Amino acid sequence: MVYSTNILLAIVTILTGVFIWSRRTYVYWQRRRVKFVQPTHLLGNLSRVLRLEESFALQLRRFYFDERFRNEPVVGIYLFHQPALLIRDLQLVRTVLVEDFVSFSNRFAKCDGRSDKMGALSLFLAKQPEWREIRTRLAPAFAGAKLKQMFSLMEEIGCDLEWYLKRLTRDLRRGDAERGAIVSIKDVCDLYNTDMIASIAFGLRSYSLRNTQSEIGSHCQDLFRPNVRRIIDLFVIFYLPKLVPLLRPKLFTEPHAEFLRRVIQLVIEERERGGDLRNDLIEMLLTLKKEADLQQDKSHFTHHRDFLAAQAASFEVAGIETCSASMSFALYELAKQPLMQSRLRREIREAFASNPNGRLTYEAVARMEFLDMVVEETLRKYPIVPLLERECTPINKKRFYSLRPHAECYTRRGMPVFISNLAIHHDPKYWPDPDRFDPERFSAANKALQAPMSYMPFGAGPRNCIGMQIGLLQIKLGLVYFLHQHRVEICDRTVERIQFDAKFALLASEQRIYLKVDCL
């Protein structure tokens, strides 16, 4: 009896302690007179995210537009017990991402270098000072001159896309000249972007557009296919980084990591034996390897066997899903607006005709103004990376960083801050009638009127997307070769309005986007 009473007393004491600790934790913003979203005990503001009712990015958008915070520069939130800030003021956004980058130079997300070296060395999640060195070493590969050199490789994949569409529409139109091909447009874009990244990042031709069962394509699909373990791993990495050393999640699954190691090693060995010289990103990785071999400090992180594979994995993550989704959303909007699609097609055909041999050139793509406008408006309405996050890292070992004069509060060392570029891109204050797809927003005259920091599909500041230019070129070439000889139309299976997937961290359609594709 006494034993049972002691157990009961211990349980009550523990629960009481947890309750008191929880109450004290959740008055953090209240004590600092910062308006905040009311948390749920133990879960903070993540209860809907944990129930898969709403992605974290969609939740931040909802908080951003909450009437209670209309005039607030910042909003307090909680990741379980961790206080965090949602930034609403654009000048404060500039301060965090650009002007005082040194105080917010790391991402909050984390991989443990002991259990997941590939994740920790990837450019996306690397911490200072490793991040700065990796970024500096990779930057030359993404310069404009390098893009021009890679253009012929990218054009090959564009031609494969056009061939694929011709075969697709020919096979499905037999016996019915008016029918066309009803396709899941994202699936087609996935094949194109898989081939593109395989070529320019891995130095391989995967031929996904000619053989949809390619090995590279299969591994890439597995990377983005959600399952329970993958969801848990990513949740811990991005929202519970303090538990990363204990739970040891991996940014890339072990089978995929091993596949990347094998592919990179084989390609590098072939290049070192005097294989074909290609102006691709693998040449840059080979240069990094040679530089590392010359260093006397063999313990330097560039000597780790996963360093090169980690960078290739970064190219893969950044170049397949994001570009595929962007292309899909652009084609969806163009299918709903045939006149806009026709205007773009005229520009595309003029670009081909500008070259005597009828081939597309890098310079011709650079001159396509309406294509630029369509892509930029797509990325405004559908920013595939819908939020930006940083960790407070004050300099000189300070514990706090003041947000004055923009907000009457401060962030403490290690605190995450979030910026909802999805919400900013849909704020009527900056973008009138934000749900309307209107490329004219990005005409030369209208771009001059845009509020600074109101358009950030690739982030901003020193830690913006290093592959922005190559990603834009990849999307543009995909649209050019898709619409050059084909048109897209809505059909009975086309969704009337895009609903975003609550289970996906990136911006993705909950339903498949079906469009009718036909030859011209």
From Swiss-Prot:
State the PROSITE patterns in the record. CYTOCHROME_P450 (PS00086)
Q: Which Gene3D superfamilies match?
A: Cytochrome P450
Q: Where does it localize?
A: Endoplasmic reticulum membrane; Microsome membrane
Q: What is its EC number?
A: 1.14.-.-
Q: Which GO terms describe its biological process?
A: insecticide catabolic process; response to DDT
> What InterPro entries does the database record attribute to this sequence?
Cyt_P450, Cyt_P450_CS, Cyt_P450_E_grp-I, Cyt_P450_sf, Insect_CytP450_Detox
* Topology with respect to the bilayer: Peripheral membrane protein
An example GO CC term for this entry is: endoplasmic reticulum membrane
CDD domains given for it?
CYP6-like
Under which main EC class is this enzyme filed?
oxidoreductase
Residues the record lists as binding heme? C465
Family membership: Belongs to the cytochrome P450 family.
Name this polypeptide is given: Probable cytochrome P450 6v1
Record organism: Drosophila melanogaster (Fruit fly)
Its lineage opens with: Eukaryota, Metazoa, Ecdysozoa, Arthropoda, Hexapoda
